[in-house]
């Protein structure tokens, strides 16, 4: 496979798994006051995508394909559940210029988002019921769920990762490690190609003076050959002229001899 195709495929893989880079999203979320809006928009679009996939899985006639699609839906839901937890932290965070009513409105948005996420069918009814009970039930009214708006910092153990999310994180780290190893191999190959190209350029630079010298010698030989041909042509013309003159003298003598013989014979 050409190196350029490998580079394009690596870029596509990096773009495909970029949204799973939790550290990157964490840095983006902490970079500005509008981190909540960005994360909310990202989660909302991901929920729409996973909902479409769940609908496809529900209409899939191939059982194996449906199971695989449901497994992917569950993994995505686990990842989005972690993002919802982050969104919840951002919702209760005090920001300059943000009123208490606006923070409460953000909390309501988080609750609605969590309800939408847990309502997505994933082929695991027991897991869905358990998840709904953990969130207070998908059908429970939002007013029964309260946020402690005075709690600014929460302990690290307040939010626990689920087993599925931990497995997905391990799988993601393993895939990213393999991709990094592949990228390192590609980088080494590119360095080798770069060194080879540099060596070829050096050899070509060394051959340039030799080629110029050869061209000079060929031009000199061509000029000498042309001059030799001109001189040879002149010699041939001169030889031909001298030979013709001698033949003419001989013929004239023969004719005069014949005429003299005839004249003497007649007398």
Swiss-Prot record:
<feature type="coiled-coil region">
    <location>
        <begin position="53"/>
        <end position="87"/>
    </location>
</feature>
<dbReference type="InterPro" id="IPR045242">
    <property type="entry name" value="Syntaxin"/>
</dbReference>
<comment type="similarity">
    <text>Belongs to the syntaxin family.</text>
</comment>
<keyword id="KW-0653">Protein transport</keyword>
<keyword id="KW-0813">Transport</keyword>
<dbReference type="InterPro" id="IPR000727">
    <property type="entry name" value="T_SNARE_dom"/>
</dbReference>
<comment type="subunit">
    <text>Part of the t-SNARE complex.</text>
</comment>
<keyword id="KW-0812">Transmembrane</keyword>
<feature type="topological domain" description="Vesicular">
    <location>
        <begin position="266"/>
        <end position="267"/>
    </location>
</feature>
<keyword id="KW-0472">Membrane</keyword>
<feature type="transmembrane region" description="Helical; Anchor for type IV membrane protein">
    <location>
        <begin position="245"/>
        <end position="265"/>
    </location>
</feature>
<feature type="topological domain" description="Cytoplasmic">
    <location>
        <begin position="1"/>
        <end position="244"/>
    </location>
</feature>
<feature type="domain" description="t-SNARE coiled-coil homology">
    <location>
        <begin position="173"/>
        <end position="235"/>
    </location>
</feature>
<keyword id="KW-0175">Coiled coil</keyword>
<comment type="function">
    <text>Vesicle trafficking protein that functions in the secretory pathway.</text>
</comment>
<dbReference type="GO" id="GO:0005484">
    <property type="term" value="F:SNAP receptor activity"/>
</dbReference>
<protein>
    <recommendedName>
        <fullName>Syntaxin-72</fullName>
    </recommendedName>
</protein>
<dbReference type="GO" id="GO:0006886">
    <property type="term" value="P:intracellular protein transport"/>
</dbReference>
<dbReference type="InterPro" id="IPR006012">
    <property type="entry name" value="Syntaxin/epimorphin_CS"/>
</dbReference>
<dbReference type="Pfam" id="PF05739">
    <property type="entry name" value="SNARE"/>
</dbReference>
<dbReference type="GO" id="GO:0016020">
    <property type="term" value="C:membrane"/>
</dbReference>
<keyword id="KW-1133">Transmembrane helix</keyword>
């Amino acid at each position: 496979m050409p190196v350029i195709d490998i580079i394009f495929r690596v870029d596509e893989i990096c773009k495909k798994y970029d949204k799973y880079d939790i550290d990157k999203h964490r840095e983006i979320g902490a970079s500005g006051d509008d981190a909540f809006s960005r994360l909310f928009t990202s989660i909302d679009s991901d929920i729409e995508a996973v909902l479409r996939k769940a609908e496809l899985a529900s209409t899939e006639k191939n059982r194996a394909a449906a199971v695989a699609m449901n497994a992917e839906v569950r993994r995505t839901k686990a990842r989005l559940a972690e993002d919802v937890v982050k969104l919840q932290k951002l919702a209760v965070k005090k920001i300059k210029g943000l009123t208490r009513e606006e923070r409460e409105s953000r909390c309501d948005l988080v609750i609605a988002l969590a309800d939408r996420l847990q309502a997505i069918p994933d082929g695991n009814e027991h897991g869905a019921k358990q998840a709904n009970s953990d969130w207070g039930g998908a059908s429970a009214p939002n007013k029964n769920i309260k946020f402690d708006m005075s709690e600014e910092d929460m302990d690290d153990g307040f939010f626990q990762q689920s087993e599925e999310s931990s497995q997905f994180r391990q799988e993601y780290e393993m895939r990213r490690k393999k991709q990094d190893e592949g990228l390192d191999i590609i980088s080494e190959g590119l360095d080798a190609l770069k060194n080879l190209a540099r060596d070829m350029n050096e050899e070509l630079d060394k051959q340039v003076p030799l080629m110029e010298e050869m061209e000079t010698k060929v031009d000199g030989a061509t000029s000498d050959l042309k001059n030799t041909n001109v001189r040879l042509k002149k010699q041939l013309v001169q030889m031909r002229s001298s030979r013709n003159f001698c033949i003419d003298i001989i013929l004239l003598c023969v004719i005069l001899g014949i005429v003299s013989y005839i004249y003497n014979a007649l007398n």
